[in-house]
Amino acid sequence: MRKKLMALGIIFLVLIAGINVTKTIIQDNQAIDAFLLHVTLQGEYKIGDGEWKPIVAGEHISAGKGDVTLRGSLHMAFPNGEIVAPVSQNSSVVFFLDHLGGNVNMDGQEPYVFDSENNRIGKATCGEYWFIYGYEGAESEIVEIHLTNPHVYGNEFAIDEFLSSMRMYESGYFERMMAEDTAGLKIVGYCITLVAIIIIGIALFSTLIRLDVSKIMWYAGAAIFFAGTYFVADATNTYIWNMNIALTTTIFVLSIMLYGFFLGAFTSICFEKPFKKVGYGTMAVSGAITGGLLIFTLFSNTKLYDVFAVWIILQTITAAVLLVISCINVRYVKGMMRLVQIVFIISLIAMILDVVGTRYGWWQGCCCSSIVFIIQFFAALFAVLLV
C-alpha cells in the first residue's frame, strides 16, 4: 500500500510539472505573437493547367496533383484571420517549405527563386525549412507564386502549410517563437529516447547474464528509441541559415522506417509457437527489403525521401499480415500477454490508418501512431511504477 501511494505521488508530481510547463509555453507564445502578424494571400490558385479557383482559408489544396500556382495580394492579419493592412514595400515575409521549390513573380521584377532541392542552399537539401522573402512590391500589388513538389508521397499538405504559416519576419522574435512552439514535443522526444537507452542498457546486461527476456528488451528498446528520435526530428525547426536540412530529413525518415520494423519484430516475438514462424518470416522479408532500399539510396542519386513511397507499400502489407496474425493469436494467450497483444493490434491499426490518411489527405504525418504511442508509453510507465 505504501509503495502504491508513493507511485501515485510521483505520478501526481509529474503531471503537475507537465501542466505548469504547458501553461508557461502557452502564455509566453501569446505575448510573442503580438509582434509577429500572420500573412494571408487573398486571391486564387490553380493546379497544373487547370481552372483558377478562389483560395479559401482552411480548404485543402493538394500538393500531389501537379505544380500549384497562387495568385493574389499579400495582407497582414491577426492569427484569427482578421485583415490588418496590405504588406508594405521592403517588408520581410517568411515562408515554410515542406519539400517544395518555386518562385515569386511580380510585374517588372526578376523572379524570386527559392528551391529546397537545389545546391544553392547546400548539397542534397531535401527537407523542410523556412525561407525569408523580401517583398519589393507596392501595397496590394498582385504576386504570382509558382510551387513545385518533386516528390510523390509524404508532403500532401505542403501547400496548406505554405499558406497557413506565412507571417511577417522579425529577427529574434521569429526564432524564439519557433523554438518555443516545438519545445514540448522535443522534451517528450528526449524523455522517450532516455527511457529507451535505459531499456537497451538493461537488455545488454540481460544478454550478458543470459536471461530469456533479453531479446524482448532489445526490440522494445529499439522501437521506443526510434519513436523518440522521430519526435525530436519532427519538432526540429530548420531556419534559413541552418545547413542540417538533409540530416534532419534523413533522421526523420529512418526513425519512421526503423520504428515500424522494430514494432513488427516486437509484435512477432510475442506470438504463440504456431504463428512465430510466420511472424519471423514476414519481418525477415520486410527487413531485407528495407535494407535493400537503404543500400540503393547509398549507391545512387535517389534521395531517401523518394523511396519512402515504396517503403510505405511494404509497411502496409507487413502491418496488415501482422494485424491478422495478432487478431488470431490473441485468442490463444491469457492474462498480461493478451493485454500486450491488444496493444500491438492498436499500434498496427494506427500505423495503417496513418499510411492511408497521408495518402488521401485525411490528416498529416504519423498523427494516429504518435497519439497511440504516447498514451501507451506513459500508461506503461505508470503501470511499472504501480507494480
What are these regions (language model features)?
Residues 59-70, 117-127:
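Extracellular beta-rich ligand/substrate-recognition surface
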Residues 199-229, 272:
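Juxtamembrane interface at the cytosolic side of transmembrane helices
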Residues 82-106, 143-145:
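Aromatic-lined ligand-binding clefts that engage carbohydrates, nucleic acids, or primary amines
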Residues 104-160:
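Beta-strand-rich ligand-recognition modules
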Residues 64-85, 130-131:
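Short beta-strands within extracellular/lumenal beta-sheet-rich domains
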Residues 1-63, 146-180, 208:
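Accessory carbohydrate-binding/adhesion or oligomerization-edge regions at the termini
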Residues 170, 176-210, 309-330:
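First transmembrane helix
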Residues 228-269, 273-387:
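Interfacial "cap-and-anchor" motif at the non-cytosolic start of specific transmembrane alpha-helices
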